[in-house]
């Protein structure tokens, strides 16, 4: 049957499929546009399943938040070209907004379907790999940061015995700076108490091997090893790291200083870091 060019264009605008595919779909469905759209989607889903084994090493991190709640998600695709595509980014923002508005805290079929529709049009394997929903309590303040390349995202929640200090600009700026710090230094742990004892023991043995040949008394060697362990922990633990905007103080000491100057205590309640392909 003859198919109008205007009908083909309308179907293409709706589905994103190629002109010839749209024409064939309309012919297959006897000119019924709704059936043709359904046919293309079903055909597209089959193609998506065939692409499911393809590696998705590119993608973006997306955050939707206010100062009491945040949704952060990771969405992956096959190529950097698609990761930077406006439609891909828009779908990520739409998924984050839906999860935020509906208080969703995990990947659901509803959220997956939003991405699946784009995957059928773009013809690339895509995945909604993880999603987290973080809430701040009445005595807490939430801040967040997304790096410009959209490959690193940070959510931080600070707590105070005087929550009114969170209305102060300097405290809000410090919370944001903590996010910047975490994105820049990518700590492996929040505090040194979180580090597995077996890992510390392993590092200790490595450092003992490094000082074994030194011509020094054993107690001096032990002191050197302890110093190396302390330095290593200060590099991998967020609260022990030298603060990015005042490296004379650790993050924890700077936090205490900012809180005291603002008129209350200040402590870390939660830290979440998403880096594309990794996480904390």
UniProtKB/Swiss-Prot annotation:
This is Elongation factor Ts. GO terms for molecular function: translation elongation factor activity. It comes from Treponema denticola (strain ATCC 35405 / DSM 14222 / CIP 103919 / JCM 8153 / KCTC 15104). Gene3D superfamilies: 1.10.286.20, DNA helicase RuvA subunit, C-terminal domain (1.10.8.10), Elongation factor Ts, dimerisation domain (3.30.479.20). Keywords: Cytoplasm, Elongation factor, Protein biosynthesis. PANTHER family: ELONGATION FACTOR TS, ELONGATION FACTOR TS, MITOCHONDRIAL. Belongs to the EF-Ts family. Pfam families: EF_TS. Its main location: cytoplasm. HAMAP family: EF_Ts. NCBIfam families: tsf. Associates with the EF-Tu.GDP complex and induces the exchange of GDP to GTP. It remains bound to the aminoacyl-tRNA.EF-Tu.GTP complex up to the GTP hydrolysis stage on the ribosome. GO terms for cellular component: cytoplasm. It comes from the Bacteria. Residues 79-82 are annotated as: Involved in Mg(2+) ion dislocation from EF-Tu. It is found in: Cytoplasm. Transmembrane segments: none annotated.
